[in-house]
Curated annotation (Swiss-Prot):
The keyword Transmembrane applies. The gene is ostc-b. This is Oligosaccharyltransferase complex subunit ostc-B. The lineage of its organism: Eukaryota, Metazoa, Chordata, Craniata, Vertebrata. Pathway: Protein modification; protein glycosylation. Belongs to the OSTC family. One of its GO terms (cellular component) is oligosaccharyltransferase complex.
Length: 149
């Protein structure tokens, strides 16, 4: 494989550059990187790319039996479409579930007092379970009749 990589460099000559890192560029802290990952996860799971391309409305509306327009947050019977608020709500739930797993992982640190460990376990389980069951409720709102055993 190395001989295959060597073929272009028989013709090309690499320049002799002395590059230095700019003095203003510093390594970001672990918490900064973590925050960027969580924010990007929130935006991606919320469908920000879909929202930019398709430009859906933030909420929809439906006509009730009396002829009045009522706002709806979920685009029912459409798996491949969403309103902006629907994407943000779902993204919040996914992010909350992910943070619940991270909190559960952090509760295993050896130097945490017993009360704090219990509180972290409780908060982590609540985040994960609430996220899971609310995602099921959202699926029932999105696709009525789905998940009805």
């Amino acid at each position: 494989m190395e001989s295959l990589y060597r073929i272009p460099f028989t013709v090309l000559e690499c320049p002799n550059l002395k590059l230095k890192k700019p003095s203003w560029l510093h390594m970001p802290s672990a918490m900064t990187v973590y925050a960027m990952v969580v924010v990007s996860y929130f935006l991606i799971t919320g469908g920000i790319i879909y929202d930019v391309i398709v430009e859906p409305p933030s909420v929809g509306s439906m006509t009730d039996e009396h002829g009045h327009q009522r706002p709806v947050a979920f685009l029912a019977y459409r798996v491949n479409g969403q309103y902006i608020m629907e994407g943000l709500a779902s993204s919040f739930l996914f992010t909350m579930g992910g943070l619940g797993f991270i909190i559960l992982d952090r509760s295993n640190a050896p130097n945490i007092p017993k009360l704090n460990r219990f509180l972290l376990l409780f908060i982590g389980f609540v985040c994960v379970l609430l996220s899971f069951f609310m995602a099921r409720v959202f699926m029932r709102m999105k696709l009525p009749g789905y998940l009805m055993g």
